[in-house]
């Protein structure tokens, strides 16, 4: 049975983890959200989130975006390549409803799977 938990080892926790991804990322994005990814040697994917107050003013909106992103990652974790991902929210992401945000994330995860197979 496949575990769909979201333990600590699936998260990017330190600034050095984020810097590693920002150095040579593979990008997949929409006008509202970008996912940067870089292959890791851990054998499983990890995720980090950046939702700036500058782009999403209200705390409850930032929390909603992070919650939906984590849930999308948690459900797809076994299909994703062994990469470190950083999800960057841009202006306008707060205007998306939950369904539109989830669909955008699914599309970006699929694109990263294709990018990983191609490299």
Curated annotation (Swiss-Prot):
Q: What is this protein called?
A: Ribonuclease P protein component
Q: Which GO terms describe its biological process?
A: tRNA 5'-leader removal
Q: What EC number(s) does the entry state?
A: 3.1.26.5
Assembly, per entry: Consists of a catalytic RNA component (M1 or rnpB) and a protein subunit.
Matching entries from HAMAP family are given as: RNase_P (MF_00227)
Per the record, its GO cellular-component terms are: ribonuclease P complex
Q: What class of enzyme is it?
A: hydrolase
Keyword annotations for this protein, in alphabetical order, are: Endonuclease, Hydrolase, Nuclease, RNA-binding, tRNA processing
Keyword RNA-binding among record annotations: yes
Give the similarity note: Belongs to the RnpA family.
* Matches recorded under Pfam families: Ribonuclease_P
Name the InterPro entries on file. Ribosomal_Su5_D2-typ_SF, Ribsml_uS5_D2-typ_fold_subgr, RNase_P, RNase_P_CS
Question: Is Membrane tagged as a keyword?
Answer: no
Quote the function comment for this protein: RNaseP catalyzes the removal of the 5'-leader sequence from pre-tRNA to produce the mature 5'-terminus. It can also cleave other RNA substrates such as 4.5S RNA. The protein component plays an auxiliary but essential role in vivo by binding to the 5'-leader sequence and broadening the substrate specificity of the ribozyme.
The species is: Citrobacter koseri (strain ATCC BAA-895 / CDC 4225-83 / SGSC4696)
For this protein, what reaction is catalysed? Answer: Endonucleolytic cleavage of RNA, removing 5'-extranucleotides from tRNA precursor
Question: For this protein, what is any one GO molecular function term?
Answer: tRNA binding
From the UniProt annotation, give the residues forming the signal peptide: none
């Amino acid at each position: 049975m496949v575990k769909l938990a979201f333990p600590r080892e699936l998260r990017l926790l330190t600034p050095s983890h984020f810097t590693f991804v920002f150095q040579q990322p593979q990008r997949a994005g929409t006008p509202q959200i970008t996912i940067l990814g870089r292959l890791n040697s851990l054998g499983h994917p990890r995720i980090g989130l950046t939702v700036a107050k500058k782009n999403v003013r209200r705390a409850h909106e930032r929390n909603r975006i992070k919650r939906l992103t984590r849930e999308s990652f948690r459900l797809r974790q076994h299909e994703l390549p062994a990469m470190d991902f950083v999800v960057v929210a841009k202006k306008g992401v707060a205007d998306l409803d939950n369904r539109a945000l989830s669909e955008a994330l699914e599309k970006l995860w699929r694109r990263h799977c294709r990018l990983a197979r191609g490299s």
